[in-house]
């Protein structure tokens, strides 16, 4: 049996390698960590979550909830590890960041069909290759990819991560546990602000000194990871209608909704580390400490990691890739993960999943397994390969890329839930063939 080289052991690469190995395909997994790390990585584990620890909404009224359920039913390694290391997060699936990455790493390294070869890859290998090196691909490999693709086929945007702080340093006399509208369990720490406190905070935030990031412009930021200071510049109330919105978060001390609320989400299973929800930033570290200390409950907060910003590179995929994430000009090469233009942890996993199982089928002489566009997995593959998309941008999974129902359903949540049920019904008819090893 021919082997496959998978470059990169992030979410997409780990999932892809696992799916190939499960189907009897020998895999050589190349990963430059721990010998060389990117600016966003901290540990040497595979599948390290560099931004939030949340895999977003869990319900089937959310497109990402549907995508997770599809992957879960099809034996995704990433979803299995995420479920096993989940931490309380209201209606979202959030994980113990280190525990999750450790479990993925141990699973991948323990598979008999996967051989790990550490070290940086500087050229595209011969034979069957899946490039899942991520948006922070090293310069040498990025140059090799650019040479293979020709000029003008790589694009970029900027991404940011939020700070991580310790629970013990949060002033709980000025904060309270609650979930929005009391849905689920009260898993979030809520840090309320009065009008005067918020206005003073906003005034300092918009003029705080930013770290230098070569080539950064506000217009080059992905909306889903907009730095909090960039969002604040859009207007004094922008944050209050965004990540700091107080709706449904009644302060038990006053019996009223605060003027603004900063939410903290648990980042590990022990509940000793929390991240500032929506506080992606590229302020200088000293400025982060100064400005964020103006939030009453965080006046003495201790940070384990300050927010950082980095450039993300992705492909002009509609011109380059087919629906299986293969290079149209050279099908022995496939890509997976955020560099294909899918945005988000779960979306990256899905691309690695599909690239892996389709490559395994090709190597076994089997026909491609076409996931229809009614499924979230299929819709993502068709989005990144749709040549009619002129201005290709990274995108999260959403119901807009899935065909509508053939009948009217009252209410958006009900409609989305029915779209999900249709997708899962289709998926269940394919399940046996997908899982055949």
Stretches found by the model and what they are:
Residues 18-79, 373-384:
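N-terminal FAD cofactor-binding segment of flavoenzymes
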Residues 48-59, 83-99:
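Dinucleotide-binding Rossmann-like beta1-alpha1 core, especially the glycine-rich loop
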Residues 276-342, 349-351, 369-386, 392-396, ...:
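A glycine-rich dinucleotide-binding beta-alpha-beta segment and adjacent secondary-structure elements
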Residues 348-369:
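Internal hydrophobic alpha-helix adjacent to the cofactor/substrate pocket in enzyme cavities
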Residues 1-12:
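Beta1/beta-strand and adjacent pyrophosphate-binding region of the FAD-binding site
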Residues 110-285, 289-290:
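Predominantly flavin-linked oxidoreductase catalytic cores and closely associated redox partners
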Residues 97-116:
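Helical element adjacent to the flavin cofactor pocket in flavoenzyme catalytic cores
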Residues 394-437:
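C-terminal auxiliary extensions adjacent to catalytic cores
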